[in-house]
Amino acid sequence: MECTVSWTGNAGTRSGMGFIAETGSGHVLAMDGAPDASRPENGGQNLAPRPMETVLAGTGGCTAYDVVLILKRGRHDVRGCSVRLTSERADTDPKVFTRIHMQFTVTGRGIPPAAVERAIAMSHEKYCSASIMLGKTAQITTGFEIVEA
């Protein structure tokens, strides 16, 4: 896996904190920083997600992918899946994630709660490299609801 991240500044001015990531699979992702009122030249313009937001989003994508795949392989009638991630970070540098809660909503027909619980556990214990890495610094908790469709 590879990725190239380039500083773009704000709208090409080279004065902000905008970045573009180009992935090895040919996709592009924009990132930006929060505005800094005390030093505007060092802040972003809030035009794109912050880098750590992309880490959190990537973790959500990784685990949701696993959960859907595991449920489908178990021949469950899964029709939708979303995960809402909330987090806390350390107050001092490096501001690593210290707590992450993942709340899954799985939509389908006749999906047993035990199957969803198992899929989430398998993702977090075996398959989702992102959540396994973040679990080294953060306490990760999960919850789920099943919506009958």
Model-assigned labels for residue ranges:
Residues M1-A57, V68-A149:
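Extended beta-strand/beta-hairpin segments
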